[in-house]
């Protein structure tokens, strides 16, 4: 029987398989690594396309308007290469709801996101894989994730604190920086059994900060009883403001 990720490594080292031979056995050409690279390439290509679409359909000041809403102030300068764009960029493209009146052209018939409007108008431009990825980004809201375990250079075992779901997130750079019990505000999407960050806040939260998230969870449960994906999309402003 093949060893599970959390089982003792068959080599007899005494440590978990995922932190021993599992990492060594994963080559750059294995299916998971190939899929991870493909998803990241699609993410970068779609972000550029959606940004062009937004500039054309919403005007050049949509970046400033998005920044004002995201940070709650107009004093934060926009720099597309800044760490803050790790959170602002994906939220702006996939999660920010745009009023119908703001669209100059190619807008949806009702309030929607930049990505959902693009899918309505230009889905035929995308190959099937890119379309599924974009649909996953539109469907999934940002949430707070707590790091439970880390495999440096590979990924992180994480719990969605608000929905109570556990996922193994393939993330090479963040897995080298985050520690167990830290938390991140992130946009984790799932495609073909792989989970990865499509966006995250630039600053990790420490364990003491979890108290505020627990208070947010209690508030959400009081309003909705069950915290679902739809609830998190609807309460985006409250979650983001925590």
Give the role of each language-model region.
Residues 1-157, 161-242:
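Acidic/negatively charged segments and metal-coordination signatures
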């Amino acid at each position: 029987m093949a060893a599970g990720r959390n089982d003792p490594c068959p080599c007899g080292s005494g440590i978990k398989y995922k932190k021993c031979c599992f990492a060594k056995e994963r080559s750059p050409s294995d299916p998971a690594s190939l899929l991870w690279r493909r998803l990241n390439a699609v993410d970068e290509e779609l972000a550029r396309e959606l940004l062009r679409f937004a500039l054309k359909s919403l005007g050049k000041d949509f970046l400033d308007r998005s920044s004002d809403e995201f940070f709650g102030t107009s004093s934060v300068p926009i720099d597309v290469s800044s760490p803050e764009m790790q959170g602002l960029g994906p939220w702006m493209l996939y999660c920010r709801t745009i009023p119908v009146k703001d669209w100059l052209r190619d807008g949806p018939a009702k309030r929607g996101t930049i990505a959902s409007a693009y899918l309505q108008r230009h889905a035929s431009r995308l190959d099937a894989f890119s379309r599924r990825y974009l649909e996953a980004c539109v469907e999934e809201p940002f949430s707070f994730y707590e790091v439970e375990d880390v495999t440096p250079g590979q990924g992180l075992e994480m719990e969605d604190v608000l929905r109570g779901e556990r996922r193994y997130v393939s993330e090479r750079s963040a897995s080298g920086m985050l520690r167990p019990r830290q938390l991140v505000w992130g946009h984790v999407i799932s495609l073909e059994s792989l989970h990865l960050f499509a966006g995250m806040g630039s600053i990790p939260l420490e364990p003491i900060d979890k108290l505020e998230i627990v208070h947010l969870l209690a508030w959400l449960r009081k309003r909705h009883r069950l915290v679902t994906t739809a609830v998190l999309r609807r309460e985006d402003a409250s979650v983001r403001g925590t």
